[in-house]
Amino acid sequence: MSNHTHHPKFKTLKRAWKASKYFIVGLSCLYKFNLKSLVQTALTTLAMITLTSLVITAIIYISVGNAKAKPTSKPTTQQTQQLQNHTPPPLTEHNYKSTHTSIQSTTLSQPPNIDTTSGTTYGHPTNRTQNRKIKSQSTPLATRKPPINPLGSNPPENHQDHNNSQTLPHVPCSTCEGNPACSPLCQIELERAPSSAPTITLKKAPKPKTTKKPTKTTIYHRTSPEAKLQTKKIMVTPQQGILSSPEHQTNQSTTQISQHTSI
């Protein structure tokens, strides 16, 4: 309570309590003088004052308790300093050497395992594994970047093919007469003679043949009206010829004679 005595609300409560004391003393004096009506009004006012003061004190205690219960979200400066002090130092070459030497000393101090049955001795295989772990922890994995070839640059040629291929001297077979050592060279030269590079001819793709179907052509001749009349006359002329035949004439003459006789 000593911390909260300087709060302004507590000061007002103290003043209200003192005023209520004086008020009670005055009521007692009035009761002695038999003034009951005034005493009743004073008691009601005093009861109202006490109730309000109790409500105010309850609100103050609740607000103070909630403020204490809430944790601080942001860390203080002391906490940050403690965290910085507890962080381990980064791995340097000196630290790596010291740890490496300490591990070696511990491994050397351990005696090798001896089999009593076979009489063979063998060292601990943990040295290699521990050294590998330390190297993996100390040296980070180097990220290998693929070589970037600029545009238009040819890829590197394999020089192993040039080194592996042995160039034999060209020995003509005509000079190998009587030399037994020359004949295999001549044969090898013939086998390994560089053949002429084959010429690549690009064949053009044949165009697809399209077979066209023959179309029937109908020719229409225009005939003039004069030509039509000539064709009609040609058709009529043989009939006239038939009528003007000699047999027809004899028949006509006989009919005329018969007619004259009848008359």
From Swiss-Prot:
Basic residues composition-biased segments: 204-215
Pfam family, one: Glycoprotein_G
BP GO terms, sorted: symbiont entry into host cell; virion attachment to host cell
Chain segments annotated as transmembrane: 38-66
Disulfide bond sites: 173-186, 176-182
Region called Disordered, residue ranges: 69-166, 197-218, 244-263
Site-annotated residues for Cleavage: 65-66
Extracellular side of membrane: 67-263
Keyword Phosphoprotein: no
Biased composition (Polar residues): 98-129, 151-166
GO terms under cellular component: extracellular region; host cell plasma membrane; membrane; virion membrane
InterPro entries on file: G_prot
Compositionally biased residues, Low complexity: 72-86
Sites where a glycan is attached: 72, 80, 87, 92, 105, 127, 139, 163, 199, 215, 231, 251, 253
Keywords: Disulfide bond, Glycoprotein, Host cell membrane, Host membrane, Host-virus interaction, Membrane, Secreted, Transmembrane, Transmembrane helix, Viral attachment to host cell, Viral immunoevasion, Virion, Virus entry into host cell
Cytoplasmic side: 1-37
Region annotation (Binding to host heparan sulfate) ranges: 187-198
Family membership noted in the UniProt record: Belongs to the pneumoviruses glycoprotein G family.
Protein name listed in UniProt: Major surface glycoprotein G
UniProt source species: Bovine respiratory syncytial virus (strain 4642) (BRS)
Taxonomic classification: Viruses, Riboviria, Orthornavirae, Negarnaviricota, Haploviricotina
